[in-house]
Structures are given as structure tokens and as C-alpha cells.
From Swiss-Prot:
Gene: NCED1
Family, per entry: Belongs to the carotenoid oxygenase family.
Binding site for Fe cation: 331, 380, 446, 624
Protein name (database record): 9-cis-epoxycarotenoid dioxygenase NCED1, chloroplastic
Organism, scientific name: Oryza sativa subsp. japonica
GO cellular component, one term: chloroplast stroma
A GO biological process held by the record: abscisic acid biosynthetic process
UniProt-listed PANTHER family: BETA-CAROTENE DIOXYGENASE, CAROTENOID CLEAVAGE DIOXYGENASE 4, CHLOROPLASTIC-RELATED
Major subcellular location class: plastid
One Pfam entry name: RPE65
Listed cofactors: Fe(2+)
Amino acid sequence: MQRICPAHCSVTHSLTMKSMRLSYIPPAASAAPQSPSYGRKKNASAAPPSAAASTTVLTSPLVTTTRTPKQTEQEDEQLVAKTKTTRTVIATTNGRAAPSQSRPRRRPAPAAAASAASLPMTFCNALEEVINTFIDPPALRPAVDPRNVLTSNFVPVDELPPTPCPVVRGAIPRCLAGGAYIRNGPNPQHLPRGPHHLFDGDGMLHSLLLPSPASSGDDPVLCSRYVQTYKYLVERDAGAPVLPNVFSGFHGVAGMARGAVVAARVLTGQMNPLEGVGLANTSLAYFAGRLYALGESDLPYAVRVHPDTGEVTTHGRCDFGGRLVMGMTAHPKKDPVTGELFAFRYGPVPPFVTYFRFDPAGNKGADVPIFSVQQPSFLHDFAITERYAIFPEIQIVMKPMDMVVGGGSPVGSDPGKVPRLGVIPRYATDESEMRWFEVPGFNIMHSVNAWEEAGGEELVLVAPNVLSIEHALEHMELVHSCVEKVRINLRTGVVTRTPLAAGNFDFPVINPAFLGRRNRYGYFGVGDPAPKIGGVAKLDFDRAGEGDCTVAQRDFGPGCFAGEPFFVADDVEGNGNEDDGYLVCYVHDEATGENRFVVMDARSPDLEIVAEVQLPGRVPYGFHGLFVTQAELQSQHQ
């Protein structure tokens, strides 16, 4: 099989000190010291509408007020014709040519806002430069040093319009035909000279539309687009970052100074925080006929993948009829039987956790504040059963005073805190029936699944336990996990724990039809080390107590790393077994620069690769993905 390396791009230097933009750094050169300033070329043609006039708030039922320009149906039809024409050009040694390795095109950056900056904007930009130059520490910690964080395949990429890709191995299974695999992840459009954490990049969706059964001969189509959050639009129009990020923008005195500059920008009308100041870079959810890009620091953003062209568009923030006024978890749970969606939000002010749900039509229910959480904690994920919701309270906490007094981050670990699991009836209207169970040393970032046993008297939770939680934000390469099965006896209050595997597994997925119900198999990314994923493992939970429960594993080879696997059930040719389906993910070869979409047989003892698609552009390492079926794509609300 021929392997093609994308053209390596060098880091370009700029005289401007406002921002820096990274091009792809080849692995061999990624460790070399970089210039503290990077240039970003601007297109001086037509400037798009300002951010204030180009965002959309979606409600449920659908009510739109102002903003993001949507493609018209005529534009979609033109794109269909253009994509189909392009597809005829691709041929390889097996009848198709390898895709072009030219760099993806970036949408033109507006020049008007930068060239005609107002006096208040100029003043605030100057203050940012003072902070960057004189207040930021001369040496940033590795976890927030952009020259350390954004190297190799963590370097951001440009947007990629819908581009055909050849299938270079096997054949796409019929159960995937016509659907799209979409992966979310951080991809900063600007990089400040100040600190930057991996979690803080703008969200970019990398969508691979697979050909439908009726379109024989067509190729899959890859499209990479930014989620156009209000923050993204404001900074795009400004030509530089203007809003601090949660994990890197509020460190020490410099963080407080940046907060003051943001306040000045708000008071002078440069931005409106009510439009949202957060990211949508973590995950995706398909619910009530809409596809959402999710991040904990803002409301969900409605996005759409065109079922014919593969184009990805942002349609605006969704407040669900004005009932969702703050952000929510990036890991909501959709009950596969009832169609309901369960979610929560957390924050630095009481109530530190609030639980809520949506009915199958997308109507949000009442908030249930959880006042028994007495300290602001980092609560990234949770679990549901048929009758309960389970909340983990871990040792990562919010500590604003550490930023003020110690010059540290407002988010850090508290080794003296005892982790707990909170159990509440999932249809509770208040927290009066909330029960907490101490589980020392049990720190989870992601849950696998939960269910009820013994007639509802016992709850079972499966999750990777982060054994070195103090490194989860600062030294991810030192993080190690052990997957555990935790059993909570609601009658006696006794909690028992059984280790299932100690292979540094995280980013778990299951067959989504079993969410909240007893299931047997889970699939995990294998840290090599974290945050890189060097392989995929399959665990059999029924083997609990027999030692290592790993029953299948695939390593992608030296220098090859993947993202989170996603399980797609085979509802076409399968026999209905839980593991009847396929695992899909993107894989990057750091030696050659080659990128693939990989399909693995979830039933095989070695997770056999049954199909590969060669991608025309680089897909950076990211977070969570989703497979959307052809029927779901076609039923998306406009």
C-alpha cells in the first residue's frame, strides 16, 4: 500500500505581536524551539458580518433571533453538483488515485475589524500586550506552554471543504452506509503568546460522510469546520484572541489582569457575554432531530451535516425555549428506550451542581439544584440507570483563591478530599432523596455504564479510575487508569469495588442500545501515554473477579495514534448480539503524516480492521465523536 506524506509546512514568523498561528510541525522538528511569535495571514477581500450580527440563538420549538448565515438550498444543490464532479477525478493503484496533499483552505479572515479597530479595542489590545510581555511569567509551565502543548498532531489545522477520500482497504460495512462519523476536538484559530491548555482550543468538527447504498462508486467525503461559537466569531473578527479560556486564561496575577481587560471590553461594547463566552470543543449529541456540538463552558450549538454534500454548518446556540440559560455537561445521557436526555451543569457558585432532563421532543424540564455538593468540583461525566442518576464528586476542584494568592490555576486537585458517589432518583423534583456514598480514591473522568441489579437494591457502575488524579490537568502523560466495577447496595450502604483491567484505559464506549441497562462489553482507548491513544481494547465485564477482563486489543503500531473509538451496531447483517457491530476512529501516523479512518470488527478476537479510508488532510488528536446514521442525517431540522 502506498503511503503519502502531506507536505510539511514550516512555522512562519511575523513582526506582529498580537497573536501567533502555528502551521504543521513535522514530528522530527516538533521538539525544536519555536519563535515566540507567529504570523497569521489575513485576506483583505470582503469582510464578513461582525460577530454581533452573525450568531444565532435556537430555541425549542425552533425560534431564531439574528445571526449565523445559513446555506440556502440553492447553495446546497450547487455544492452537491460540485462534490459529485470532484469525485470522478480520484484514482489509486487499485483504481483510484491518492487524494491531493495540498493544505486545507482557511475561510478568509476579516480584515475590516482589525484594520479599523476602535479606540477602546486598541487600548484593550495594548493592555493585553502589557500582560503578555510584563506580567506573564517568563517561563510557562509545560501544561500551558503552547510550544509544548501544540506540537506534532496537536498542531491546529485549517478548515477543509468537503473533499472526496478513497477507500484503500476492504469495504465500508452496510450498516455505516450513508451515515457520518463526526469527531469534535480543540483547534485554536489564534494562539496567544500567553498560556494555552490543550482543553482550551476552539471546537472543530471533522466529519466523514460515507456513501449511501444508492450511490455506488462514490467516495467518502471529509469536511473539517469550526463550530462558530460567539467566542469564535468575536475573535475571528478581531483577528486575535480576546476572551481568556478556563484552563489557561486565569492563572495568577496575569489571569486577574486578563479578567479586568475582559470587563473593559464588555463595558465598552466590544462583546456581549450574554451571547456566550465559552467553547463547543468536547463532544456531540444527536437528539430530537438536531445535532449538537457540546462544551461545558457554553450552551449547546446546533450544527448540521448535509446528507448529500457532507458540508458542516453551525446554526447557532440553543437555549431550549429559554429554559437553558447556562452551559451543560458535554456528556448527556440519552435513554435508548424512552428517548429522554438527562444532563447537568456545574459551576463555581452555589448550587455547584444542577440536574435536569429533556423529554423526547427536546423540551427541557425543571432544574433540580444539588445543594449537598458543598464545594465546586470538576464534574465532567455522570451515569444513569433505569431509575437513578449517579454523580461522581472527585478530587479535582475549583479553587479561585489559589489563583489570587498562589499564582496558580483556579482548577486543581485536593488530595485531602474523599471522593463520593451521589445517587438521586432520575425523575426527582428536588434533592431530598439524594444519597452520598464515600468511595476513597475513586476519581473518574468518564463513566462507561451503570445499571440496577437485585431488583433495584444494588447499583453497578463501571468506570476508569484515574489513579494519579493530581496529574490529570498538568501532566497528562503521567496519568494512569484502572477500570473498576463499583457496586452500591442501597439498602445497607455498603460499596464494593472490583478491578477489571489496569491497562491505562479511558475514553470508553459501549453499544448505545444498552445505556443504563446491564451490558457485558466496553471498548476503550489505550493511553500510550495519555493524551495519545495507541490502541483499542475490549473488556468483558462478566469476567469481573477473574483477573484482567481484557478479551481483545488492537495496537495501531509504532508512531500511530488514534482518537476515541465509537461503537456502531450492525443492524443490517448482525444477529442482535451486544458486540455485533463495528468500532470506528481516526488514526494518524506521526512518521509519514498519513491519516486514516479505520473500521474494526468489534466481534473479532483482535478487533480486525475491515476497512480504511485515506484522508486528504490531517485530523488533529481530539476528544469525543459520534456516528450519525443516514436516517438521522436526513431528518435533521433545518
